[in-house]
């Protein structure tokens, strides 16, 4: 499989620099060294491809509404979420907007083509860099609904267990948390209705992830 799927659902708490190292260490710890290389090989493109920052293509067809997958691009975890109609309505609700520090995405954390209420090219599909803008931990994906950790009435989004930062399902940061910025949106484009390419802008657009306020 050419697409670089890491996981669906909840992502582990891991610093950005240790993202791949921790995966490799965990596999070795349980005595499956023989499976290590095939796993890492499926996790990321070849080393020379990564070094060049080459784009990564992702097949969206297996992703169900409400499901999130994680891929790796330039060593960063990239979240691809298929949002439901109800989740999209929540993103536009005054109740959600009132919780946010930068609801209009005024800070430069995304390309111009994602500077909208859903912070994406197509409302259904969210593509975010899964790194907290506080100290670089990887937040947990917390779907809508009550949970022991998030409590009742949680609208859905992301929670960073490091210091409690929260984001909605568009990656917009809540007010009153340590993280100062919304989650970054990487450059990406649709190759078809069911495939995106991360690391490449739509035709006529220019954007580099390195230019954002905070990764």
Feature annotation, model-predicted:
Residues 16, 22, 49-52:
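Short sequence/structural segments immediately N-terminal
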């Amino acid at each position: 499989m050419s697409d670089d799927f890491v996981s669906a659902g909840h992502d582990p708490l891991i610093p950005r620099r240790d993202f791949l190292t921790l995966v490799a260490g965990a596999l070795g710890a349980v005595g499956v060294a023989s499976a290590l290389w095939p796993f890492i090989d499926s996790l990321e493109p070849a080393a020379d491809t990564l070094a060049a920052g080459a784009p990564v293509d992702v097949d969206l067809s297996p992703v169900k509404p409400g499901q999130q997958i994680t891929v790796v691009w330039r060593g960063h975890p990239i979240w691809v979420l298929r949002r439901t109609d109800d989740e999209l309505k929540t993103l536009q609700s005054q109740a959600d907007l009132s919780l946010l520090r930068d609801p209009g995405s005024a800070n430069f954390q995304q390309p111009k083509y994602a500077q909208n209420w859903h912070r994406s090219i197509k409302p259904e599909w969210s593509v975010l860099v899964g790194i907290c803008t506080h100290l670089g931990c990887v937040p947990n994906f917390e779907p809508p609904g009550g949970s022991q950790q998030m409590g009742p009435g949680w609208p859905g989004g992301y929670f960073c267990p490091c210091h409690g930062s929260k984001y909605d399902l568009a990656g917009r940061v809540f007010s009153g948390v340590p993280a100062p910025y919304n989650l970054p949106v990487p450059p990406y484009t649709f190759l078809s209705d069911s495939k995106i390419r991360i690391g490449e802008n739509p035709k006529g657009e220019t954007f580099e992830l390195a230019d954002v306020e905070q990764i």
